[in-house]
Amino acid sequence: MNIEFSQHAWEEFNFWVQTDPTVTERICELIDEISHNPFKGTGKPEPLKFSLQGYWSRRITGEHRLVYKVEGKNGVDQTCFIIQCRFHYDD
């Protein structure tokens, strides 16, 4: 699976790299898990609704969520598009 960050999500990820190694590690673990099983596992994966329909979220912490969308066929042709990794998707 390929992993792609939106510009916004990449900036958020770099914020964590600079400020909190524990959260950075958690995000990396979630991304690794998503690459093997996008819709099940830790972080309580849940499909989002309304304007984010088609996207999923996983809990990074009590406050922060990883928001992503998976497209393509299983395996090498799949891509995970990460659009957020800081704050809650309603914020």
Residue ranges and their predicted role:
Residues 29, 49-52, 68-72:
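Short alpha-helical linear motifs
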Residues 32-58:
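A short, surface-exposed loop/turn module that caps and links secondary-structure elements
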